[in-house]
């Protein structure tokens, strides 16, 4: 499933062509994705201007004129492709030539400038919703989400307080979207390695008895932020389905230290151990038992 860096990469790729553009027409090539598309979907989008493109956790938010927001979730295998058109009179870096549509191109937006924005989703776990602007943060998909890990509200003090009473594993705590929004399996594994913390460690041990941050909490916040920023800069990680909107692969997977490296040597200088894989709450966890305590 695309995590925060992949969704943020898509958001940044959409801005040059979709933000400020008018949707001339929309095609819904099937009535549903994970859930049914909104009633009168094509009619409700035709003629609307996209005022801004934001992100909350793993959700893309397209503000429409008229006081509504289109929520788009990529699900397990969704991707967005831009074809044709030009930005400011010349081809944009996120454009590529228009090609034949595929069987999994389920929604197509035709923009007034000639470009098309296509949502492709082979497994159909994605979703597109249209919600009134003043109800967006109370919508069930977004209500209750924790702070953004790259935002000012996420720091060592917050993380320590949030974990202080948790007796689950540290990895399970970080995957809880109510604690911090947008983190997934890949980047939690990588951040824990950088912070030198075992995924088996109990979450409350990064805080003092009073809920104050320890050095562990401080290291972990820095590691999470660094991993996410580097992944965004690299265009995300392409393991199965993720593509940037110009069709290119992300390449952060080439810098993985632990994820999907079971049995391979740890890359830490002087460490002679190998990367191990365990299963936690039904998900594979990769870590170095020597470097992570």
Swiss-Prot record:
A zinc finger (FPG-type) spans 257-293. GO terms for molecular function: 8-oxo-7,8-dihydroguanine DNA N-glycosylase activity; class I DNA-(apurinic or apyrimidinic site) endonuclease activity; damaged DNA binding; zinc ion binding. Binds 1 zinc ion per subunit. The active site is at residues 2-3, 58, 283. DNA binds at residues 104, 123, 166. PROSITE patterns: FPG_CAT, ZF_FPG_1, ZF_FPG_2. It comes from the Bacteria. InterPro entries: DNA_glyclase/AP_lyase_DNA-bd (IPR015886), DNA_glyclase_Znf_dom_DNA_BS (IPR015887), Formamido-pyr_DNA_Glyclase (IPR020629), FPG_cat (IPR012319), MutM-like_N-ter (IPR035937), Ribosomal_uS13-like_H2TH (IPR010979), Znf_DNA_glyclase/AP_lyase (IPR000214), Znf_FPG/IleRS (IPR010663). Keywords: DNA damage, DNA repair, DNA-binding, Glycosidase, Hydrolase, Lyase, Metal-binding, Multifunctional enzyme, Zinc, Zinc-finger. Its EC number is 3.2.2.23, 4.2.99.18. It catalyses: Hydrolysis of DNA containing ring-opened 7-methylguanine residues, releasing 2,6-diamino-4-hydroxy-5-(N-methyl)formamidopyrimidine; 2'-deoxyribonucleotide-(2'-deoxyribose 5'-phosphate)-2'-deoxyribonucleotide-DNA = a 3'-end 2'-deoxyribonucleotide-(2,3-dehydro-2,3-deoxyribose 5'-phosphate)-DNA + a 5'-end 5'-phospho-2'-deoxyribonucleoside-DNA + H(+). GO terms for biological process: base-excision repair. Belongs to the FPG family. Monomer. Involved in base excision repair of DNA damaged by oxidation or by mutagenic agents. Acts as a DNA glycosylase that recognizes and removes damaged bases. Has a preference for oxidized purines, such as 7,8-dihydro-8-oxoguanine (8-oxoG). Has AP (apurinic/apyrimidinic) lyase activity and introduces nicks in the DNA strand. Cleaves the DNA backbone by beta-delta elimination to generate a single-strand break at the site of the removed base with both 3'- and 5'-phosphates. HAMAP family: Fapy_DNA_glycosyl. This is Formamidopyrimidine-DNA glycosylase. It comes from Xanthobacter autotrophicus (strain ATCC BAA-1158 / Py2). The gene is mutM.
